[in-house]
Amino acid sequence: MIKRALLSTYKKEKVVDFAQTLQELGIEIISTGGTAKKLQENSIEVTPVEEITNFPEILNGRVKTLNPFIQGGILARRENKQDMETLENLKIEPIDLIYVNLYPFVEVANKRDVDMNELIEFIDIGGPTMIRSAAKNYKDVIVVVDESDLEQISAKLKTPEELDENYRLYLASKAFNLTAFYDSCISNYLNAQLTNKDDFQEFLTVPFEKSYEMRYGENPHQSAIFYKNTLTSGAMTSFEQLNGKELSFNNLRDADSAWKAVNEFEDTACCCLKHSSPCGIALGDSVIEAYQKAYSCDPVSIFGGIVAFNRKIDVETALELKKIFLEIIMAPEYDEEALDILKEKKNLRILKMNSKPIDTYEYVSVDGGILVQEVDKRVINEFEVVTETKVSEEIKEELLFAWKAVKHVKSNAIVVSKNKATTGIGAGQPNRIWAATQALERSKDKGGDVLASDAFFPFSDVVEKAAEYGIKAIIQPGGSIRDDESIQACSKYGIAMVFTGMRHFKHI
């Protein structure tokens, strides 16, 4: 039976209504500081926590409830004779319910230029301690940490048999979930402030919170949720959806891939993408030129895909985009008239992107664990020419473009390009010659000046195939024990080849 409750909340919007319910049920209310004042202002009878502890709040409120008269009242097991005798001997009254919410550490931490001395005061100590104590003793104590549960709990208090052990366990699980999340936020924030921070800590406790529930996952029979990183606001959590249906699991994954690809470039760029694989990447002097060049790489695969830009979409481009069926269009800005044109397609998802990609690490789930690695952000501006045939400044720029593009193609990956536009892409093949054949064959009607490979050539067969299609220069990491064979083949056909010394495998 619930006889005494302790209420201590930072957010006080719903505490009054809940306290009124408790009072109507004859439940004694204990409360702290500002919460007690709020309740008293609303004519609710409250016992200040100092009257229970016989000790004042000290250190400007740092110590309020860290006291045996509070912790003992929460942790005592009602069916344990020794526990209850201890309470009786020490004149400690049991506490049967607590409602606690915590200092808003995250909200303050996410403010710009927050002072560490100020932030430290928003690390709650007493609140998590009470929550953990009550959750540990869930069979005897109701622990409430989520204001969305208050209405249901208020109803159940009127029929106590509904506060069964399973429901209490649910509340306890939720409570420990909150305190673990809260501590994770603090740990990760403090680690990020270190001069020599630990990039890979002993325990992985990255704080993610539920953003929204999706209709389904990758397939209709799979359930899915989107969780966002609490301490950062990345591109996929800060965009504005200006039109269209809700985003699906696949939409978000593909949009993330397209946005990362198009932001690889400083110049005006466009990326057309389907099923997380680029089907066209291009630069242009204008947005429309970049789009037309990217589209022409593979006008078949783009049907039902995504088009991303790193510049404002104008009317001319909007009119072209409207001609085909697309799932998503992404850009940092839209001309007002261009947006009106695109909105004529009611189901077209139009995203206004408010952030460039910011993630430092990426996570891959494997059965029983998670792989964590740094995001592949390394760029090159120079390379080693390993053939007698040298490269002009124009070809050098083309090679650097193709190298950036191939980084975003699933391995084994080959990109053929001309005029800073992909003309053929070979993706996800189990061997490199198949990827090369795919890319070269797709480029043959459009032509290609250079070929980029995400990893080294184990044999000279890719060079032989490239020569058949008139490739002038090749960029690859180098590092194969048979590099000499590929270099000799290039010399045979007058093809320039450069080594970057860096690989760009992409398996997800």
UniProtKB/Swiss-Prot annotation:
The keyword Endoplasmic reticulum does not apply. The keyword Transmembrane does not apply. The gene is purH. Belongs to the PurH family. It comes from Petrotoga mobilis (strain DSM 10674 / SJ95). This is Bifunctional purine biosynthesis protein PurH. GO terms for biological process: 'de novo' IMP biosynthetic process. Pfam families: AICARFT_IMPCHas, MGS. SMART domains: AICARFT_IMPCHas, MGS. Transmembrane segments: none annotated. It comes from the Bacteria. PANTHER family: BIFUNCTIONAL PURINE BIOSYNTHESIS PROTEIN ATIC, BIFUNCTIONAL PURINE BIOSYNTHESIS PROTEIN PURH. Keywords: Hydrolase, Multifunctional enzyme, Purine biosynthesis, Transferase.
